[in-house]
Amino acid sequence: MKSLFEQFEIDLYCIIITRFFDISITTITVYLGLLMVIVIGMYKVSLYKATIIGGNNWQHIGEMIYEFVVDLIIEQVGKPGILFFPFIMSLFLFVLTLNVMGLIPLSFTVTGQLLVTFTLAITIMIGITIWGFRIHGIKFLNIFVPSGIEPWLLPLLVFIEIMSYVLRPISLAVRLFANMLAGHLLIHIIGVAAIYLMQFYFIGILPWICVIAFMFLELGIAFLQAYVFVLLTLIYIANIINLH
C-alpha cells in the first residue's frame, strides 16, 4: 500500500452511464451488494428451523438485535416510535455491518467515505422533516420557536434553532466518518510499524499485540458508532413527534 489513504480510494469496475443516470459499478457498489447478501443471509439462517424455545445460535443473535432495537426505540421515542422499527432496524444493521466489514484486512470502509455518511444523514433528515409536516402540518414550524422566551429574543433564537436543525445531518455524518477514518488510519500505522519491527525478533511481537488489541477496540467502536447514529436519529424523530 503506497499511501496511507489508499485504503479509502474508490475504484471504478464497470462504467454504466445512461441518458439521465450514472449507475457505474464502484467499490461502494460492490460492498453495498455484499452488505445485502450478508444481512439477508444472516436472517435467513436465523429463521431456518426457528423455534419459540431453543433455536440455533443465529436465531439468538437475531432476537438479541431485535430486542435491542425495540428497547432503544421505546426508551427514546415511546410506543408511537414502533412505527419506525423497520427503518431503525435496517439503519442499525446497515451501519453496523459496513463498519465491521471495514475491519477486514485489505478491505474497503464504506462508512469511511464522507459522501456515503452525508448522503445517508441528509436523506434521513429530509425524510423525517417531510413526515413531520405530514403529521403536524404547518404547526411543525413550532419546533423552531422556543416557548417562554422574551419577544425581543425570539428572532435570534429562531435563527439558532433553524441553523441547529440544518446542521444536524452534517454533525451526524461527520461523527461517523471521522471515527471510522481515524480508527482505520491508526490500525494501518501500527500495522506498518509491526511489519517493520518484525526484523527485531521479540520486539516485533509487541506491535502485533497492539494491532490485535486495536482491532478489538475498533470492533467495539464499530458497534458504538452504529448505536450512536441510530440513537441520534431516534432523538431527532422524538423531537419532531413532540415538537421540541
UniProtKB/Swiss-Prot annotation:
Protein's name according to its UniProt entry: ATP synthase subunit a
GO cellular component assignments: mitochondrial inner membrane; proton-transporting ATP synthase complex
Organism superkingdom: Eukaryota
Pfam families noted in UniProt: ATP-synt_A
Keyword Transmembrane helix: yes
InterPro entries, sorted: ATP_synth_F0_asu, ATP_synth_F0_asu_AS, ATP_synth_F0_asu_bact/mt, F0_ATP_A_sf
CDD domains (UniProt xref): ATP-synt_Fo_a_6
Protein task: Mitochondrial membrane ATP synthase (F(1)F(0) ATP synthase or Complex V) produces ATP from ADP in the presence of a proton gradient across the membrane which is generated by electron transport complexes of the respiratory chain. F-type ATPases consist of two structural domains, F(1) - containing the extramembraneous catalytic core and F(0) - containing the membrane proton channel, linked together by a central stalk and a peripheral stalk. During catalysis, ATP synthesis in the catalytic domain of F(1) is coupled via a rotary mechanism of the central stalk subunits to proton translocation.
Keywords annotated in UniProt: ATP synthesis, CF(0), Hydrogen ion transport, Ion transport, Membrane, Mitochondrion, Mitochondrion inner membrane, Transmembrane, Transmembrane helix, Transport
Family in the record: Belongs to the ATPase A chain family.
Organism name: Dictyostelium discoideum
Localization of this protein: Mitochondrion inner membrane
Predominant subcellular localization, coarse grouping: mitochondrion
GO molecular-function term, one example from the UniProt record: proton transmembrane transporter activity
Recorded topology in the membrane: Multi-pass membrane protein
Transmembrane intervals: 20-40, 81-101, 113-133, 140-160, 176-196, 202-222, 223-243
Subunit organization: F-type ATPases have 2 components, CF(1) - the catalytic core - and CF(0) - the membrane proton channel. CF(1) has five subunits: alpha(3), beta(3), gamma(1), delta(1), epsilon(1). CF(0) has three main subunits: a, b and c.
Gene3D superfamilies attached to this UniProt entry: ATP synthase, F0 complex, subunit A
GO biological process, one term: proton motive force-driven ATP synthesis
